[in-house]
Amino acid sequence: MLLLINVILTLWVSCANGQVKPCDFPDIKHGGLFHENMRRPYFPVAVGKYYSYYCDEHFETPSGSYWDYIHCTQNGWSPAVPCLRKCYFPYLENGYNQNYGRKFVQGNSTEVACHPGYGLPKAQTTVTCTEKGWSPTPRCIRVRTCSKSDIEIENGFISESSSIYILNKEIQYKCKPGYATADGNSSGSITCLQNGWSAQPICINSSEKCGPPPPISNGDTTSFLLKVYVPQSRVEYQCQPYYELQGSNYVTCSNGEWSEPPRCIHPCIITEENMNKNNIKLKGRSDRKYYAKTGDTIEFMCKLGYNANTSILSFQAVCREGIVEYPRCE
């Protein structure tokens, strides 16, 4: 008992003098100290102390043995993870078994090679040995495949010899001379996805492609512009606030040209200044500034103390492409 008190006092004095922190009793996950019940009363211990420990079944020390030594260092116990999981690679049905029976240690990863048409869940290609075992479990399951016969390509060809492609497989195609992809390149690629091929290959005559669609005043396209558009591509336009779109919202690429773009018609801006000049105000409204679209009817009335100086019909003015004729009161 006296020896234990001396050890504790020595450690306390060392800490008080700014020396390194001692080590508490080690918590060895999936293992433990040999004779730990006998050793526990002597903790904490000084830097430099070491003890033999063991690992549970399915675990091993970093040196690969059943037991080893754990050391108290300035940074704590070393090794920090005394017991590591052992994972043995299982036999793979529908896969290649070059790793069958091989041991991997916690933190190690390895690639899994499955037969064509098979793969790991979620299209993964590697598995990792973790504290709880393999993640994901090494098994080759039937996966989505894409057939070369489902590809329709005009004015181009696919040079690959395979007829079946696994999920996420990308293949290249080339266009014949005088033809190009939608991006203007001589070749492109498509990918096998869960619902089939990502797209059908496109090889179009260079003369049939369109450049960016024409700009319009007081409006813009609703999508980012491309450098090249394939035939029958459509682009949508929209106008700035208060402007009215006249014509079709869309233009279409055909024979290398775009269809007629729409126009954005100016609104009529009814200002307090113009109304004061004519001694009028908006009927039933108190706006100091009012926007009206082409075709809208704007109703005016005379200010208090003034009488109409123009026809009664003029007080129901119609907005025509940004122009409105104001009535007048005297």
UniProtKB/Swiss-Prot annotation:
PROSITE patterns: SUSHI. GO terms for biological process: complement activation. GO terms for molecular function: complement component C3b binding. Residues 22-84, 85-142, 144-205, 208-266, 267-330 form the Sushi domain. Residues 1-18 form the signal peptide. CDD domains: CCP. The keyword Translocase does not apply. It comes from the Eukaryota. PANTHER family: COMPLEMENT FACTOR H-RELATED, COMPLEMENT FACTOR H-RELATED PROTEIN 3-RELATED. Might be involved in complement regulation. This is Complement factor H-related protein 3. It comes from Homo sapiens.
